[in-house]
Amino acid sequence: MKKVGIVMGSDSDLPILRKTMDTLTSLGIPYECHIYSAHRTPEEARDFAVSARANGFGVLIAAAGMAAHLAGAIAANTTLLVIGIPCKGPCLDGIDALLSTVMMPSGIPVATVAVNGGVNAALLSAQILAVEDAELAAKLDARRAADAAKVLEKDAALQAELNG
C-alpha cells in the first residue's frame, strides 16, 4: 500500500494532525509526518513534494494556518493529490487559512477539507487509496456502517426518553 505524506507548517498544527494520524492508523494506512514551512523552509517543502512519488507516497496532506500557503506550495511541485487542511489560527476562526488553501490557480488543484478537518483529510486519503485496494475499501465501508449504527443507537435512546 502506498503511504500518505503529512506535512504541517508548524508544530501548533500537531493536535489537528494527531487526529489525522490516528485515523490513518486505525485503517492500517502507513504514513510519514513532517514539519515544513512554505515560508521558512521552502526548499525542504519543495524537495519533499518533488520526491514524494518516488518515495512511495500516494496522497499528500498539508496543514497550515493563517497565510496557509503550504498546500499550494506542495501541490506546485507534485502531481500527486494534495489535500489541504486549513487550521484555525489566532484570528478569523480559520477563514483566512481556508481561503488561502482553497483559492488555487487553475492547473494547481488542492482538495480542501473543513477548517481543522484532520479526520476527513485522512478519510479522503483512504478513499483515494481504496480505489485500487479492495481491503481498504472494505475497512472504509465497515467504518461508515459503525458510524451509522452509533447514530441509530443515539436515536433509539432519544426516542425511548421522549416516548418512555
Predicted regions and their residues:
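N-terminal beta-loop-helix "entrance" segment that forms/cooperates
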Residues: 33-54
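Active-site nucleophile and cofactor-binding loops and adjacent substrate-binding regions
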Residues: 37-38, 63-67, 86, 112-117
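Short glycine/serine/threonine-rich phosphate/pyrophosphate-binding segments
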Residues: 13-17, 41-45, 64-73, 92-95, ...
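Glycine/small-residue-rich loop that forms an oxyanion/phosphate-binding "nest" at active or ligand-binding sites
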Residues: 77-106
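C-terminal binding/interaction regions
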Residues: 8-15, 19-20, 95-164
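Glycine-rich phosphate-binding loop
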Residues: 48-86
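Glycine/charged-rich beta-loop-alpha catalytic/anionic-binding loops adjacent to active sites
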Residues: 2, 29-32, 79-80, 102-110
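Glycine-rich phosphate/diphosphate-binding loop of Rossmann-like nucleotide-binding domains
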Residues: 2-40
